[in-house]
């Protein structure tokens, strides 16, 4: 008979930061009696989830991928943004073998170099400085046909901020003497991660056939027309940009296609549509035979050259629990499932021995402000059942609402999202109390605590660099101040009586009073 476990649950409230300013702060204005009570009764502090503390550049806002890698690995992990920016500064980028091979193969075949990615200074999925470096490198190596397929942001940046980026790249190509922007489309279509293939197909058809809803002779003109249609950057319809002769640039046999996003989760679907022989997400009218390169590693099943392969993380929390014969559960909705599994495990797809996973489907709505509670009730039903089963030593759960609804910029919906999560936490804490379990409540980064950009007055749809909550609901304890996300895994190991491996550089934040 299996011994009953007293589970330790880590509840990650995605996009839930702490902000002193209460103006347009959805978390402050939400009615959250459960969290208010827990903060009053139990030890708590604030920890850092941004900038240098998570391996990002100083001042750079945190994000879900980075947050979960730090949470699960127990160390500050040098992030792809920093790593690639450093390679550019050190002039190593222009010698990268995978990128050089792609450019050279296209030149040799008389083809074009196509560069696609999120044209954004947001630094969450990509950075436009990296895209600029790629354009410069391609021309420097002798490419005369360089085409940029720009995915527009408006989510990790202000909703209407793409104009300066597009203007900059128009000027860049003029300076370089070669290349141009070939198409623009909102990330809503090109970077879907929830198997909404009808969206992805529009980006695929745009790049491979020039098939678009609109056609313009200039990218800025195309963007301004989208604004006239009331489309913010994220939702810009497929727009092909013609050259002086009225021609569109499409991906052909012998061309190279370089995907400049460094974050994996929203890069996987469109990548598979380009390279998987047995792809069945939608009907592909053409499948060009081209040289495809990914900037980083997107998934184990994606077989393409990688410019910057993942660094192997040893002795993450999941791996240590496996080695000690512990059981663990990972649970979230579709939107954050990859984060509590792949990213939390340091970029490993396969579950560890003793690791169960539960995926709850996120609601099929256009944007989550239409259903701010998302699937939190069903998620909590499954989580409570898992706690009551007493099967697990450690449970990792992510509630996506604060982030996913925060990204819509809809203040009232974000308030409702926070209230829904608070009610769920109450159920989880009650279930843990019945079985003698404990929980840590924290977040991966901020978002919902700032719903308006104080400078522009526009909706603030991006993450923030605010500190995030850290609450321990359990035994009588003290909590150290000044912690960061990488301290969470060592804290969990200490609470369950396991040794912290040398690879974990984080420090335990919770100290039980004997």
From Swiss-Prot:
Single biological process term from Gene Ontology: glucose catabolic process
Residues binding Mn(2+) 1, per UniProt: 403, 407, 463
Annotated TM spans: none
GO molecular function (one): manganese ion binding
Co-factor binding details: Binds 2 manganese ions per subunit.
Binding site for Mn(2+) 2: 14, 64, 444-445
Reaction equations catalysed: (2R)-2-phosphoglycerate = (2R)-3-phosphoglycerate
CDD domains for the chain: iPGM
Disulfide bonds: none
Gene3D superfamilies, alphabetized: Alkaline Phosphatase, subunit A, BPG-independent phosphoglycerate mutase, domain B
Pathway given in the UniProt record: Carbohydrate degradation; glycolysis; pyruvate from D-glyceraldehyde 3-phosphate: step 3/5
GO cellular component: cytosol
UniProt binding sites for substrate: 125, 155-156, 187, 193, 263-266, 336
The protein's Enzyme Commission number: 5.4.2.12
UniProt-listed Pfam families: iPGM_N (PF06415), Metalloenzyme (PF01676)
Cofactor(s) it depends on: Mn(2+)
Keyword Metal-binding included in the entry's annotation: yes
Active-site residues, as the UniProt record annotates them: 64 (phosphoserine intermediate)
Keywords: Glycolysis, Isomerase, Manganese, Metal-binding
Family: Belongs to the BPG-independent phosphoglycerate mutase family.
Task performed by this protein: Catalyzes the interconversion of 2-phosphoglycerate and 3-phosphoglycerate.
Subunit field text: Monomer.
Protein name: 2,3-bisphosphoglycerate-independent phosphoglycerate mutase
Naturally occurring in which organism (per UniProt): Shewanella baltica (strain OS155 / ATCC BAA-1091)
Gene symbol of the encoding locus: gpmI
